[in-house]
Amino acid sequence: MDALLKPIYEGVMEGDQDLVVDGVKAALEAKVSAEAILKQGMMPAMAKVGQLFEEGEYFVPELLIAARAMQGGLDILKPLLTSEDVQPIGTVVTGTVQGDLHDIGKNLVGMMMKGAGFEIIDLGSDVKPEQFIAAVKESGAQLVAMSALLTTTMANMPATIKAFEDAGMRDSVKILIGGAPVTQAFADKIGADGFAPDASQAAKVALTLVN
């Protein structure tokens, strides 16, 4: 790894936002492209964080601070990535379904997907089916990632899928679901395209769904 990218990688791994921000600024001053900083510094670090989470070495707090550190760097890079015409892998609309106010898990999913190179449109929590549809229409997103943390709100997942069918948009968008009570069997039953048990897996499944 380029010596200039090492502090950025380590800063994300350690959840040290100052280290990431200083590293990004130093790399840019040394004429490293925003794309290289993102794809060779930050994205590999978030992938490693996801791997350590899956292996039980890292837990949710480590994921959160790593993602926050990465966001500090992304805030600097975003306008530069646009001017370099670096395209995201895909666009994902995220949200917790109608009636459900939980958003920590959904936020983590968004952060891990950003780390994998996706553009994220976060609708927040308590999102109605028509809000998901409007966001996809407006953004041209290829993927919708919905979460539910309560068994009572899970029923709003098939309702959202049906709304996409009724709008004639089901074939043009992939739907990924997750959340504590959600299972692969439930995803299969309601006709979702993918299921992820946690944020790290969500980013991996998203990559397979858009490719």
Segments the model singles out, each with a brief description of its role:
Residues 196-197:
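Ligand-binding pocket scaffold of soluble enzyme catalytic domains
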Residues 88-123:
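Glycine-rich active-site/cofactor-binding loop and its immediate structural neighborhood
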Residues 1, 84-87, 137, 167-169:
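Solvent-exposed alpha-helices and their adjacent loops that cap or buttress functional pockets
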